[in-house]
């Protein structure tokens, strides 16, 4: 291909220009611009080129609203017959739909060549010695052109006195061009006198031109001069403004015409010229060859993204040889983005007062960024970011210009680097290897530059802090950027002050600086970490001073990162992160935080060994449980451990003795006081025997480790103790869920005096020495869940008399008085124990209920049926206390109910004899449980409860007392069956414990006798005012015991299966339409079960 191309270039002046080989690129093959002579040459070589039958003369095409697409055909008869006349244009296109340019399409198929007329040659005999200009091939605007053939501008005619210029291939505004083959400007005509050769035509010109090119777009070649004049200039491949180019093919400027006499060769054309340009190049963009080389890209306000070839034109053999540019910035604000595969050959020229931002995203480093020079004029601004930027030639900056370096960018030249007056260099350094880093370098020297010209901006540095970096000039050809730590000129220091969220990795060895001059009061061997950012030590440093962590994070990036340090001091609020790597600290004074590894880092299978002594100050914290999924990590302190009230945090999956847990191993002696906080990471809890080991020491003081806060799993409370349950291994510390009977009694007896504060409780629990006959400690939250379950099922469970009070019947006339609306208030107090014999619960409740009859009917002349509705609000607050651990938990229930009731009396008038009562209601509640030191839990519950009651009212005797008070005595045996169906769904606590209620659908039976006395004074005989005191004795039996299952371990209320209830009260009518009633009841059961309740009710008759 390249040999054929070379043949055509020599024989026919190839439109891409350039003797010699074109670059071979992927999807970037050179396309040839054919003149009619080229077509003939192709036929001679056997090329299968065929064209459709042409039209004749200049053609005009108009796109109407209904005509959106047209196939163009060739046009003939465009070249003039007369000497020196201009060639005719091929197509004029107009459109009625400028807003639909993308829909107004011209198609040129692969068998079509659209060529304008060629200019006529001059003829002295005809009186016209000048050659004519070539015509334009397509002229129009607001179009889409899809080319799979050839579009050629007309060539200029040759002349003795003057020659013709080549025509343009496509000209117009608002053109969207998709080119798959060839678009070429016409060639200039040759000159045979002292007149210059004709100029080549441009391939594409216009404004607002989006172009997608997969073929070849090239300017026409300039005409040769065979006399004493200059060669003609090559045309541009594309020129205009607001150009948007996507190139996977080739753009080429036309070659300048050769001067074979005493003149100069013509200028090579530019590949792309214009203002407001956007270029995405994955092909080749080539300047034209000539006496003055053409630019590959020339313009202003450009954005160029390159992963292909951008190459300036090359010299011809003429007497004038002026280098062109690969990229020529003529003004405005410009960007050059370099991707992998980018090749720029030729100079990059930035005119005065222009701006160029270069982003180098090519990290292969295989070739220089520019094969040429970088020349920036006066008052220019050049910004570099990304990878280093290399230039094979010279670099120059004019007066008052600026060079900005960002990230890890640098500028390196193989030639000279020169700076004019008042040039400013600004470097913004985010992160680098901290070894001496070349910001600027030039193999042949840097001139016009000093350190005063540079401004270093360190975006990681805390505002106002002393910079840990410094820049200096080395050997007159390098600007070096490095750490102040290594400075030998008196400004050295060892402080790294990083702002919040900043992270700096030091990848060079920090050794003692023996040549420091103490200007900054630095000892030359100590490291100080300040500021809220993170400093990472990635090498095995050898400095011998102290490591002071005043703020932020000091993180290890390798093992033994500070092995020779005299000691490490972690101040309050600061963090030392070992990153899971073994370290030597000699001494570690921790008033801040020490992390075994990064938060949420993967599990560490090997222990982290820290050599040196640990002092854990009051504000200090050592964290082994850096992630909830990393339980089982081990921290080894290869030295002594002294606690001054700091905290050690571990994780554990708590169960039996074989539970998986983080561990602290101390090779030396443990002394002082260290508080231990253990987080259960999903363990179900279980009964332990000897305990779960979490800490081991070579030797240990008593109470060197004290439990902080509660340690819970499932239904169990764990505690920290020294040694095993059997009293062995007192140099080790264990978690246990059990306590022996003797000391549980001691705990219970001393609870009121020795457990007055939580700290005293923790110390006592931690110091217990267990023996045989131990018991396992239960969490008090179990009692709160049970108390809530009891309340939600029982607080809305009235009997007939609780709901209606007494039925008032006149003792003389037997007349019945009743109401249709009632309100009652209930207050109660409950105390019960749980089956574990550790937990005791007390609860207080209030209920506000309202109801009334909505229907009254009868089946016979004597009976009566009443139907009513009722609703209520209730609230309970409970507290459960463990007498052994002194931990408590509080529960609350708050909810509503709504339902129906129905009562039937055998004798509606007398209200004696048999009666039946039933009710059914739906209840819903919000519940909470909050244990000491634990996150509060919230859950809901709902369900249906109902009851059926029957009784017989028997009047035994009536009499009038000596004070004229009429009395009637009634006996009322009664029975009630209640089904409690309110329940909560299974609930998972914040600590992972699964909570399930038990004892649901409980059936409660009540059997009892009620005795009442209705009395009316003689002074009230004309009124309805009367009173009824009563006394009830009931036996209550429950089919189930309310309980809870926590991670498979169950506990339940005791004492409520068989309960005796005593109830007494009085009811009466205060006025004809107002009655009140009230009673007090006391329930007693086994195991200290008791429930006290009072009711006050009001009835109103309408």
Swiss-Prot record:
The lineage of its organism: Bacteria, Pseudomonadati, Pseudomonadota, Gammaproteobacteria, Enterobacterales. Keywords: Cell adhesion, Cell outer membrane, Membrane, Periplasm, Phosphoprotein, Plasmid, Repeat, Secreted, Signal, Transmembrane, Transmembrane beta strand, Virulence. This is Outer membrane autotransporter IcsA. Residues 814-1102 form the Autotransporter domain. An immunogenic protein essential for bacterial spreading, it elicits polar deposition of filamentous actin (actin-based motility). Inside the host (human) cell mediates nucleation and polymerization of actin molecules on the bacterial surface, which provides the propulsive force for intracellular movement and intercellular dissemination of the bacterium. During invasion of mammalian cells, triggers autophagy by binding to host ATG5. Interaction with IcsB leads to escape from the host autophagy defense system. Binds ATP and displays weak ATPase activity. Induction: Transcriptionally regulated by VirF. Residues 741-763 are annotated as: Disordered. Pfam families: AC_1 (PF18883), Autotransporter (PF03797), PATR (PF12951), VID (PF22364). Different strains accumulate different amounts of the intact autotransporter protein. One of its GO terms (cellular component) is extracellular region. The chain crosses the membrane at residues 808-816, 819-827, 846-854, 863-871, 912-920, 925-933, 942-950, 955-963, 969-977, 982-990, 1003-1011, 1027-1035, 1060-1068, 1072-1080, 1094-1102. SMART domains: Autotransporter. It comes from Shigella flexneri. Changing residue 44 to R: Disrupts targeting to outer membrane. Residues 741-755 have a biased composition (Polar residues). Coiled coil: none annotated. Residues 53-807, 828-845, 872-911, 934-941, 964-968, 991-1002, 1036-1059, 1081-1093 are extracellular. Residues 103-507 are annotated as: Assembly of F-actin and vinculin binding. NCBIfam families: autotrans_barl, autotrns_rpt. The signal peptide, cleaved at the inner membrane, guides the autotransporter protein to the periplasmic space. Insertion of the C-terminal translocator domain (beta domain) in the outer membrane forms a hydrophilic pore for the translocation of the passenger domain (alpha domain) to the bacterial cell surface, where IcsA is cleaved by IcsP (SopA) and released into the extracellular medium. This cleavage is important for the maintenance of the sharply polarized distribution of IcsA but is not a prerequisite for intracellular spreading.
């Amino acid at each position: 291909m390249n040999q054929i191309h070379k043949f055509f270039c020599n024989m026919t002046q190839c439109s891409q220009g350039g003797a010699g080989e074109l670059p071979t690129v992927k999807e970037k093959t050179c396309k040839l611009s054919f003149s009619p002579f080229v077509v003939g040459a192709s036929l001679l070589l056997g090329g299968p080129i065929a064209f459709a039958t042409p039209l004749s003369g200049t053609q005009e095409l108009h796109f109407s609203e209904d005509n959106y697409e047209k196939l163009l055909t060739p046009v003939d008869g465009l070249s003039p017959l007369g000497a020196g006349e201009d060639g005719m244009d091929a197509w004029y296109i107009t459109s009625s739909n400028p807003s639909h340019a993308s829909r107004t399409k011209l198609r040129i198929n692969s068998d079509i060549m659209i060529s304008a007329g060629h200019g006529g040659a001059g003829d002295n005999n005809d009186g016209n010695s000048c050659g004519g200009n070539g015509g334009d091939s397509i002229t129009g605007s607001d179009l889409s052109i899809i080319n799979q053939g050839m579009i050629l501008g007309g060539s200029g005619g040759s002349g003795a006195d003057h020659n013709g210029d080549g025509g343009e291939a496509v000209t117009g505004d608002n053109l969207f061009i998709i080119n798959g083959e060839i678009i070429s400007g016409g060639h200039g005509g040759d000159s045979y006198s002292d007149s210059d050769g004709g100029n080549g035509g441009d391939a594409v010109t216009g404004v607002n031109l989006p172009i997608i090119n997969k073929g070849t777009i090239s300017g026409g070649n300039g005409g040769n001069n065979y006399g004493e004049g200059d060669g003609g200039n090559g045309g541009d491949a594309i020129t205009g403004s607001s150009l948007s180019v996507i190139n996977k093919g080739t753009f080429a400027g036309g070659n300048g015409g050769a001067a074979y006499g005493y003149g100069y060769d013509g200028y090579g054309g530019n590949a792309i010229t214009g203002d407001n340009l956007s270029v995405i190049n994955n092909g080749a963009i080539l300047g034209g060859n000539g006496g003055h080389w053409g630019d590959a890209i020339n313009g202003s306000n450009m954005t160029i993204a390159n992963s292909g070839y951008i190459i300036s034109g090359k010299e011809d053999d003429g007497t004038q040889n002026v280098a062109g540019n690969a990229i020529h910035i003529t003004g405005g604000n410009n960007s050059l983005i370099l991707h992998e595969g980018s090749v720029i050959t030729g100079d990059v020229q930035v005119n005065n007062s222009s701006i160029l931002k270069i982003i180098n995203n090519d990290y292969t480093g295989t070739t220089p960024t520019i094969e040429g020079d970088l020349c920036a004029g006066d008052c220019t601004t050049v910004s570099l970011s990304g990878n280093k930027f290399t230039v094979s030639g010279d670099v120059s900056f004019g007066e008052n210009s600026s060079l900005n370096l960002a990230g890890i960018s640098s500028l390196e030249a193989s030639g000279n680097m020169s700076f004019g007056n008042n040039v400013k260099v600004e470097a913004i350094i985010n992160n680098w290897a901290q070894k001496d880093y070349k910001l600027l370098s030039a193999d042949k020297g840097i001139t016009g530059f000093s350190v005063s010209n540079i401004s270093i901006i360190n975006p990681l540095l805390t505002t106002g802090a002393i910079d840990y970096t410094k820049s200096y000039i080395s050997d007159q050809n390098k600007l070096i950027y490095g750490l102040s730590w290594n400075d030998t000129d008196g400004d050295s220091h060892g402080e790294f002050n990083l702002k919040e969220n900043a992270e700096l990795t030091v990848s060079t060895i920090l050794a003692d600086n023996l040549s420091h001059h103490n200007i900054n009061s630095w000892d030359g061997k100590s490291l100080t970490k300040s500021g809220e950012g993170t400093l990472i030590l990635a090498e095995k440093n050898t400095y011998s001073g102290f490591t002071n962590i005043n703020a932020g994070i000091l993180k290890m990036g390798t093992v033994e990162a500070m092995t020779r340090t005299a000691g490490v001091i972690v101040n309050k609020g600061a963090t030392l992160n070992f990153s899971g790597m073994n370290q030597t600290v000699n001494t570690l004074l921790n008033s801040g935080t020490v992390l075994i590894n990064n938060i949420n880092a993967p599990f560490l299978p090997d222990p982290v060994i820290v050599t040196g002594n640990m002092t854990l100050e009051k504000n200090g914290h050592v964290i082994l449980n850096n992630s909830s999924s990393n339980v089982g990590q081990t921290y080894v302190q290869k030295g002594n451990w002294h606690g001054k009230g700091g905290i050690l945090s571990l994780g554990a999956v708590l169960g039996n003795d074989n539970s998986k847990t983080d561990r602290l191993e101390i090779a030396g002696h443990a002394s002082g006081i260290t508080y231990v906080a253990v987080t259960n990471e999903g363990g179900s809890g279980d009964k332990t025997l000897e305990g779960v080991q979490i800490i081991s020491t070579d030797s240990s003081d008593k109470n060197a480790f004290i439990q902080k806060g509660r340690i819970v799993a499932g239904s169990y409370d764990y505690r920290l103790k020294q040694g095993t349950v059997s009293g062995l291994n007192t140099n080790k510390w264990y978690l246990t869920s059990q306590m022996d009977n003797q000391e549980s009694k001691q705990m219970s007896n001393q609870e009121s005096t020795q457990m007055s504060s939580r700290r005293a409780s923790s110390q006592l629990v931690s110091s217990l020495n267990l023996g045989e006959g131990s018991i396992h400690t239960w969490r008090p939250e179990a009692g709160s869940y049970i108390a809530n379950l009891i309340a939600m099922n029982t607080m809305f469970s009235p009997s007939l008399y609780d709901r209606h009070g007494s039925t008032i019947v006149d003792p003389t006339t037997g007349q019945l008085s009743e109401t249709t609306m009632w309100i009652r208030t209930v207050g109660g107090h409950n105390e019960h124990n749980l089956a574990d014999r550790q937990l005791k619960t007390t609860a207080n409740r209030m209920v506000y209920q309202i109801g009334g009859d909505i229907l009254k009917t009868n089946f016979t002349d004597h009976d009566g049926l009443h139907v009513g509705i009722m609703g209520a609000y209730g609230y309970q607050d409970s507290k459960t206390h463990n007498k052994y651990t002194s931990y408590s938990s509080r529960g609350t229930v708050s909810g509503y109910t709504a339902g129906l009731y129905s009562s039937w009396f055998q004798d509606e008038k007398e209200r004696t004899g048999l009666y039946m009562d039933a009710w059914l209601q739906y209840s819903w509640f919000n519940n909470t449980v909050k244990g000491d030191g634990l996150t509060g839990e919230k859950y809901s519950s709902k369900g249906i409860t109902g009851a059926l009651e029957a009784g017989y009212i028997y009047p035994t005797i009536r009499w009038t007392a000596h004070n004229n008070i009429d009395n009637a005595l009634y006996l009322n045996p009664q029975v009630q069956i209640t089904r409690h169906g309110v329940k909560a769904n299974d609930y998972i606590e914040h600590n992972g414990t699964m909570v399930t209620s038990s004892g649901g659908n409980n059936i409660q039976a009540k059997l009892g006798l009620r005795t009442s006395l209705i009395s009316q004074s003689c002074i009230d005989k004309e009124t309805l005012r009367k009173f009824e005191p009563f006394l009830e004795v009931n036996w209550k039996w429950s089919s189930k015991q309310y309980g809870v299952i926590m991670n498979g371990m169950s506990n339940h209320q005791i004492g409520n299966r068989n309960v005796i209830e005593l109830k007494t009260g009085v009811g009466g009518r205060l006025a004809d339409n107002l009655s009140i009633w009230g009673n007090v009841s006391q329930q007693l059961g086994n195991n200290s079960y008791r429930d006290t309740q009072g009711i006050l009710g009001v009835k109103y008759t309408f």
